[in-house]
Amino acid sequence: MRKVIGMGETILDILFKNRQPVAAVPGGSSFNAIISTGRVGVPCHFIGSTGADEVGQMIVDFMHANGVSTQYFEQTEEKSAVSLAFLDEAGDAHYSFYKPSVKCPGEKSHPAFAQDDVLLFGSY
């Protein structure tokens, strides 16, 4: 059966409206796509990493809650990446990023790719 494999960065977006925090949600470009894929029941994996801290655990829990396998996802000694998203009056976000030097996943293996599998990738 076809599977979708996402690869990219993960980050916790803390949303501000009128300079007050209103929500905190995991994100990242390919991460968001793979979460949507998991929500509709398509078998999917995410290759990436986050810190072994509270933020990182929130991200891992979010993947599990949305049907995304974390078999190829790493939690490292680095701190997890965080972004502050300041929403303007139109609802558009302006970001400030706080992240360690981002490393591509290394030690964990990746799933075998079949001919009909799909790979989603984004920035690191």
Model segments located where?
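Glycine-rich beta-strand-to-loop/alpha-helix junction loops that act as flexible
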Residues: 7-8, 122-124
